[in-house]
Amino acid sequence: MMHLKNITAGNPKTKEQYQLTKQFNIKWLYTEDGKNWYEEQKNFQPDTLKMVYDHNGVIICIEKDVSAINPEGANVVEVPDITANRRADISGKWMFKDGVVIKRTYTEEEQRQQAENEKQSLLQLVRDKTQLWDSQLRLGIISDENKQKLTEWMLYAQKVESTDTSSLPVTFPEQPE
């Protein structure tokens, strides 16, 4: 199985490559050990999956046809076309690590960022949920039931805002009904 690492753009290395670059504006890609990406494609098997992963191991492209891949700035690995590997996708939740395709593991910093993103998303939900009630309150036309809901959601927003996302794991308060 093929595994090409750290593929980057480089200058043409032969007269023919130079002519092709000049004529068709071709970008030449090379692995960290100097192999030409275009020449290496013929060494991939047709019945395998070709996965492109970034410097963190996160899978960013999956193809059966190696010629459909642009691996610039990444790595390409060939894996068997089996159920376990077909479960992977390019959502950012899968990675290639230690020779196998696995569910992604997140660093603490990534987990903190995810928690902060979730916090902002929850606060936006509160704004969306309470916008009409807030307008009704300002106009003095809110029903007692909606006033109670507005209060519950605003108390929830205070709890979300005070949630510390720098300390893992992060637990957010339950949403009002």
From Swiss-Prot:
It is found in: Virion; Host cytoplasm. GO terms for cellular component: host cell cytoplasm; virus tail, fiber. Keywords: Host cytoplasm, Host-virus interaction, Late protein, Viral attachment to host adhesion receptor, Viral attachment to host cell, Viral receptor tropism switching, Viral release from host cell, Viral tail assembly, Viral tail fiber assembly, Viral tail fiber protein, Viral tail protein, Virion, Virus entry into host cell. Its main location: virion. GO terms for biological process: adhesion receptor-mediated virion attachment to host cell; symbiont entry into host cell; viral tropism switching; virus tail fiber assembly. Pfam families: Caudo_TAP (PF02413). The orientation of the G segment is defined as G+ and G-. G+ orientation provides S-U fibers whereas G- provides S'-U' fibers. S-U and S'-U' dont have the same host range (e.g. respectively E.coli and C.freundii). Belongs to the tfa family. This is Tail fiber assembly protein U'. It comes from Escherichia phage Mu (Bacteriophage Mu). The gene is U'.
